Amino acid sequence: MDLWDAIKEMRRLSAEGIPFGFTFMSYDATARASKGVIEVRHARLLKREKQENHRDAEFVEAYLDLDTCQARRFYQPLLMSFNGQKVV
């Protein structure tokens, strides 16, 4: 699945209140480190952040992990799979 098709589908499902799963490679820009592959089993995207609030807002998606009820973020280019389909 194409990266932008996956992001578009994530947004559509989130707007309809339908959870989805995905994996991504973690990256902490401040520490310049990764904690490896992160699997999120049930999530919904949150409203996009503004450039004033996050320097990489155009490349970052905020999501709610429905299993932990934590709001988190991932960098779009680091998305690896969406609902079991590999993202390229």
Q: Residues of each region from the PLM?
A:
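Phosphate-interacting basic helix/loop segments used at nucleotide- and nucleic-acid interfaces
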Residues: 1-17
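Short, acidic/polar N-cap/turn motifs at the starts of alpha helices
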Residues: 10, 19-21, 60
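Acidic/proline-rich low-complexity IDRs
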Residues: 12, 44-45, 78
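A short, Trp-centered hydrophobic/proline-enriched beta-strand micro-motif
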Residues: 16-26
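Short, conserved turn/kink motifs that form compact alpha/beta structural patches or helix kinks used as
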Residues: 26-68
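Short, compact, well-ordered microdomains
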Residues: 58-88
